[in-house]
Design a protein with these regions (language model features):
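N-terminal single-pass transmembrane signal-anchor helix
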Residues: 1-33
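Short, intrinsically disordered/low-complexity patches at protein termini
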Residues: 5-7, 61-62, 131
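Structured, soluble extracytoplasmic/luminal domains of envelope-associated proteins
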Residues: 83-121
Length: 149
């Protein structure tokens, strides 16, 4: 009987240690998942910028006027796979792109309570945007870290 009690205690300590390690591992995996999602957003934004540059270079050679729309997705041929369209407010879905028609911004809603916002800029404002061409560029405005419902 005396040997059973220490074994139960050792087992309880082992379970507690494994539980603490599991919680630490889960939080580390969440941070990695957030980093991967941020990298995917940056990659998609870069692809949109490249398509904008391609479209603008084509327009510069052929001529014609620029679209009036402030939605960069309307300027390009290939929209992001998870693009919901032009909306007046934030959608319920997460991990999606949409154009906020009130703020005139392209938005990505992260799965982890954040948003990345981009704005199509023109004229003198575009001069400070990396990758701008003929006075047009896509600028990352902010990453909003808040609870968005």
């Amino acid at each position: 009987m005396d040997t059973i009690r220490p074994r139960k205690f050792e087992f309880a300590v082992l379970v507690a240690i494994i539980g603490i390690l599991a919680v630490g591992l889960m939080s580390a995996l969440d941070r990695v998942r957030e980093s991967f999602e941020e990298a995917a957003v940056q990659s998609e934004a870069a692809a949109i910028r490249v398509e904008l540059l391609d479209w603008l270079a084509h327009r510069e050679i052929i001529g014609g006027k620029l679209p009036e729309s402030r939605n960069p997705i309307r300027w390009i041929a290939q929209q992001p796979e998870n693009y919901l369209g032009e909306l007046d407010g934030a959608p319920k879905e997460r991990g999606v792109w949409y154009f906020d028609s009130r703020r005139q911004e392209l938005v990505y809603r992260f799965r982890f309570e954040r948003e990345a916002r981009f704005r199509l800029v023109r004229g003198a404002e575009a001069a400070s945007v990396p990758g701008s061409f003929v006075g047009v560029g896509l600028r990352r405005i902010e990453v909003v870290s808040k609870t968005v419902k």
